[in-house]
Amino acid sequence: FEPYIYALLKDDSAIEEVKKITAGRHGRVVKVKRAEKVKKKFLGRPIEVWKLYFTHPQDVPAIRDEIRRHSAVVDIYEYDIPFAKRYLIDKGLIPMEGDEELKMMSFDIETLYHEGEEFGTGPILMISYADEGEARVITWKKIDLPYVEVVSTEKEMIKRFLKVVKEKDPDVLITYNGDNFDFAYLKKRCEKIGIKFTLRRDGSEPKIQRMGDRFAVEVKGRIHFDLYPVIRRTINLPTYTLEAVYEAVFGTPKEKVYPEEITTAWETGEGLERVARYSMEDAKVTYELGREFFPMEAQLSRLIGQSLWDVSRSSTGNLVEWFLLRKAYERNEIAPNKPDERELARRRGGYAGGYVKEPERGLWDNIVYLDFMSLYPSIIITHNVSPDTFNREGCKEYDTAPQVGHKFCKDVQGFIPSLLGALLDERQKIKKRMKASIDPLEKKLLDYRQKAIKILANSLLPEEWIPLVENGKVRLHRIGEFVDKLMETDSELVKRNGDTEVLEVRGIRALSFDRKSKKARVMPVKAVIRHRYSGDVYEIVLGSGRRITVTEGHSLFAYGDGELREVTGGEIKAGDLLAVPRRVNLPEKKERLNLVELLRRLPEEETGDIILTIPVKGRKNFFKGMLRTLRWISGEEKRPRTARRYLEHLEGLGYVRLKKIGYEVTDREGLERYRKLYERLVEAVRYNGNKREYLVEFNAVRDVIALMPEEELRDWLVGTRNGFRMRPFVEIEEDFAKLLGYYVSEGNARKWRNQKNGWSYTVKLYNENQRVLDDMESLAERFFGRVKRGKNYIEIPRKMAYIIFENLCGTLAENKRVPEAIFTSPESVRWAFIEGYFIGDGDVHPSKRVRLSTKSELLVNGLVLLLNSLGVSAIKIRHDSGVYRVYVNEELPFTDYRKKKNAYYSHVIPKEILEETFGKVFQRSVSYEKFRELVKSEKLDGEKAKRIEWLLNGDVVLDKVLEVKKRPYEGYVYDLSVEEDENFLAGFGLLYAHNSYYGYYGYARARWYCKECAESVTAWGRDYIETTIHEIEERFGFKVLYADSVTGETEIIIKRNGKVEFVAIEELFQRVDYRIGEKEYCVLEGVEALTLDNRGRLVWKSVPYVMRHRTNKRIYRVWFTNSWYLDVTEDHSLIGYMNTSKVKPGKPLKERLVEVKPGELGESVKSLITPNRAIAHGIRVNPIAVKLWELIGLLVGDGNWGGQSNWAKYNVGLSLGLDKEEIEEKILKPLKNTGIISNYYDKSKKGDVSILSKWLARFMVRYFKDESGSKRIPEFMFNLPREYIEAFLRGLFSADGTVSLRKGVPEVRLTSVNPELSSSVRKLLWLVGVSNSMFVETNPNRYLGKESGTHSVHVRIKDKHRFAERIGFLLDRKATKLSENLGGHTSKKRAYKYDFDLVYPKKVEEIAYDGYVYDIEVEGTHRFFANGILVHNTDGFFATIPGADAETVKKKAKEFLKYINAKLPGLLELEYEGFYVRGFFVTKKKYAVIDEEGKITTRGLEIVRRDWSEIAKETQARVLEAILRHGDVEEAVRIVKDVTEKLSKYEVPPEKLVIHEQITRELKDYKATGPHVAIAKRLAARGIKIRPGTVISYIVLKGSGRIGDRAIPFDEFDPTKHRYDAEYYIENQVLPAVERILKAFGYKKEELRYQKTRQVGLGAWLKLKGKK
């Protein structure tokens, strides 16, 4: 059997040229052995290709790229299929074809373990085994139980077990994690005590081999079936202990006995019976699980065509891929290649997902479970969805997917549908051979198998450093922080399976080396990965001081047999030689610092005094003239007289091209952006006559300055208003790099409050050498002008210098870093930085080595990376007294010494390699130069020397392992997946680590992936599900409960075509574009909604559609004040804010943002979210325009205008009272002097003024009064610049606003009798970022003793500080009072650091409503502001028949199945999957049900954590029993009250209160000290050894002070001296375990304690208690 690939040629005549192509492999020439032309199919179309044969399987990877590069070759195919797999496929070999009944037997071992012991040190205490007939335990201590067999020694026990296996002779040996524990442990013990480990049928020992990041064990003549990888691939669980898996699969709990308990029992002799029972049950449940899972793996083995041993250890993605490859061969199809980067980018674009069911909360009886049989595969088959049928030309008939419109040919059957048809048939056979079709276990396993993605993650710990290239910039990250941040930002794109998460990424590259040439390069990162890990980790320390900590399965690159091979953390040992960089290749370019971009990244308050200036010379009237020209080009103005001047300027920028007559636009989009810039510039720019310059405040243009072409920007200066200014671009050349080096080594940047309450800034560079200070001074003055010089420092008192150094390099010694731009600068610039750093903080060690010192770990890694980029690899790192020292054992260009020989020098070939290569003894290592000399003189064999040629010519050197430290670890671990090279630089000091492989099918990199196919399948799926829901509701009486929607008049904040609108949601719905079930959809374009991202920032997100439907559900009105409310359906999610101790400080904001239904308000969530950040754009304003808007605000508040009189045509009136003189000076005189108003004069009433201005009178009538003559605020104001809105509000609040203190709290209100006007004022306040509320006086206003028929409406300011800062008052008396009131008042709201404020619901009530309800889809966040409150948008349902008995529900369900299946096309079929007697639903992912056999199934409610006490677990189990078995919620409440009462009275045995928590890191690394850490530190202080992995079992005692101080080890608990803290166990253990269950029935935490009186809250108003 010969290896081969396929080649498609442009011309068959070129085959002879192709056959002549050669490549090299291990010193021999590789070429095509022979070629033949064959007829194949490619995506269903006939094709003729050449089949190229080769001599050896390794010839294919050696030559394939050379063949592909040939000009006559279109492409090559099937070049990446491993030879062994190729053989199985081509020969049609199928394992597990027989139908024999296989004998199965499981086994498990218990071992003696002491903290810190090496694996296999402690003896095996018990071996248990189970088969169909019995479950027994063999041990060597006396235990009197019928199933226990006692022998004399451990050796006799193992011999007895081997004899049992031989006697029973099982075909299948079942273990749970036997690959990685039981077999390896048995093998170690057999070696130690001198027994041959004969488990194979031929009498030989099991073969233990590595497979990915794990081990795999083969037992010749038997199948070793390890359940662990099968279950990890198949079922999604929070933890994969045997106990958790057994309970998830069978619904029955299993006792857990911890290793420390086993050790104690064995050594004391007490409790051995319990350990024996536990051991027996381990074997028994492993056997039971094996019986359940083995048949499906056997069938899968037949389908895939691989052995069951392989299949059970493979990921789902790999299995599907190999199945398709086999079928493609059988059908004469060539397999498509995996996608290139361009195709991959297209595939990665998102599409709408499938339908999501949202269960109705509460307790329900008689629940039927209906499910589509293989929904997506059935759709694929029914509609012939396949890459080879998509948009296939020349077909007579097509099926078109709903909503997305993709077409699929029906004339010929597609490749994928044809295979899935056979698969579904096979699946039905499997189902018939297994349990009845309603078995939820079997259904669950098959369903998970279709969807499961298993990632094999070799991983690093979170603290490890990785250098990455992002958008051309080199950055150093801790891998945990980097991956966590990416996954938090793009959480909706993270693919999850079990406890593994994968996020595919773009635009990120890793530093790696080519596995073949060993040359360094930069390669794309395909994905970032994290997963939960519990096991051993290995800290590997190298001779150079480099170090890295990896999981047991993570590989580094070690030298062996002439090559670099992957060696796992568990295999690496002292003396191994690992790959580290000799040189790294970083992207290189001339770097330039763009100060404008740097300033744009700073907060607005940091740049408040920054200005841009440009000389007037040559630019007189330039800005206005340019804007007029741009408007003329757009057809909005006449041609300016000087247009030619501006057209020439635009031509120079590339926007237009001048002709002999006229011009043409060459860049329309660029021109539009340029105009947007000038619209703002003309508003913002002002003339400074003193300096003959134009001046612009940076903040006025910060959001448009990026639009300024570089050719223009370079003419400006940037700096502080009254201080130093500099060019906006700084070239990063040698001098600037050296100055940065000086700063990083011995500089600091500082800012402080000065005596005027402003900020002062300075940068200082220190050195004792006056010549160095001279150089520092010269460089600093070149870039920053005049500086100050002290005895041993240079001071740069410039804010711009502070900004540059602080942002590029950091400020404190502990956080200094190499500036990003230095890494990618030319080599001479990098050397200049190193020189500056060396002069500032380096020295020459007595050993003639350069020594660089720093306190910053980030800087150490940056220096090493920088030196590596310069080809310097002879580096040694040491850490002493808090200081890192980097020793460089090479001559550097700027040092004036000659390096002498030194013991540490990486540019040598280690003698161990020389001895292995040449087969003789070498006395010492040899330098590269000496080695070449020895080879050239033929003293060394030239042919043998070629084996290590890569070491001389590559970019990798070897570093010896000094020590390996092993410790346990539990927590997240991380990895990258790097394209092609499969390695990346990582760790402290940087060394090469192997990356993760991850396989998948149905994702963008799969061979047969088709984005349009996936999009169409989900669209059809949504359509069929919603149609089915509609039918079951309308025709069969099932109630459909939608989990969404708000009422039609609800106002939302949108931006349409760039303009902000406050619009009723029903007004967005203009037409019905399509229907799904009873829901109607209107597609929107150019609409964005205001929403909140997970970082707490207000952002605009696209709204693709608005949806509406009729509902018969309850509608609730949530009242915030007596006039501010929100109407929502009963189960619509609002976004609440957890402002409690339940969320620990420092946790991401998204952990505080929780979805909450109206009925849950007032329980754990008491506050909702309202916006509190400016969303109106800012400009550089005209001061007179500000005064005009202040006047308009005063008029709306205390003015009058309009009417039929002659006076009204020319005047407006303003009532000013005692404030007349102040307003006259501040507003009226300046407006009169500038001609905005003609005049003003006193009226008859004191303080009243008439303002003469014909245009103003017309303007106020046209825009500020409605048809009835009432005052209003026009909609155009919602899109005014922020400063003008603030000016208007300032005038309005000055007229009608009040300032007061109420119960010591500052109060600011605006009062009117016009609700519509007040509502508009609220919108303006939101636009400028001032949170507010509104309420109406319940008592009517009175005038002259009589009711006036009006009520006062108060707009109340929530964020008073923001109001004072941005708006304030015109009147000194009000402004002074506000300042005094706020003087001693500071807001403690944590929310104020984000873009929102909190609002507290006052009441929830049901209302009558008969109309459409609406929802919008908001991309990315799925949230929008409705009536000023943040809500969630969803789209799901859950259905049942309320009140019907079990038989009726079953009968109706089956009738419906018969009806709907007759209507569904093709293979689509709805199945009866099960029936549940009772169930309750907390949310869509948290529920519990009980079937007719009494089996309880839970999801999302399990307590499996070690750090919960037995009393918490026991109470939750009893609560579930009461609700599900007895249907009695009140009984469940009584149980909780009873437990809390017993706890309070100290009637609970202390054994049930023990909490077990593991130490996961070194004690010194803990910042927060939990109880277990506090105990561990006290134990360590006593001399007891505490390592990561140690489990602390403790109990919390009654008393005052920190919990950690009151927690003691349980073995120190003395009931005669100690009392446990009942309150702690009630509040932190028992109630949290049951609260999330019972809150579904309206109970609050305080109602579950026996001693508390019952309180009535929002939940009581909603009458949610009891069952439905």
Swiss-Prot record:
Post-translational modification: This protein undergoes a protein self splicing that involves a post-translational excision of the intervening region (intein) followed by peptide ligation.
GO molecular function, one term: DNA-directed DNA polymerase activity
Annotated catalysed reactions: DNA(n) + a 2'-deoxyribonucleoside 5'-triphosphate = DNA(n+1) + diphosphate
Known EC number: 2.7.7.7, 3.1.-.-
Protein keywords: Autocatalytic cleavage, DNA replication, DNA-binding, DNA-directed DNA polymerase, Endonuclease, Exonuclease, Hydrolase, Intron homing, Multifunctional enzyme, Nuclease, Nucleotidyltransferase, Protein splicing, Repeat, Transferase
GO BP: DNA-templated DNA replication; intein-mediated protein splicing; intron homing
InterPro entries named among the record's database cross-references: DNA-dir_DNA_pol_B, DNA-dir_DNA_pol_B_exonuc, DNA-dir_DNA_pol_B_multi_dom, DNA/RNA_pol_sf, DNA_pol_B_thumb, DNA_pol_palm_dom_sf, DNA_pol_type-B, Hint_dom_C
Domain DOD-type homing endonuclease, residue spans: 739-872, 1191-1330
Source species, domain of life: Archaea
Family: Belongs to the DNA polymerase type-B family.
NCBIfam families according to UniProt: intein_Cterm (TIGR01443), intein_Nterm (TIGR01445), pol2 (TIGR00592)
Function recorded in the entry: In addition to polymerase activity, this DNA polymerase exhibits 3' to 5' exonuclease activity.
Protein name per UniProt: DNA polymerase
Organism: Thermococcus hydrothermalis
Classification of source organism: Archaea, Methanobacteriati, Methanobacteriota, Thermococci, Thermococcales
Gene name as annotated: pol
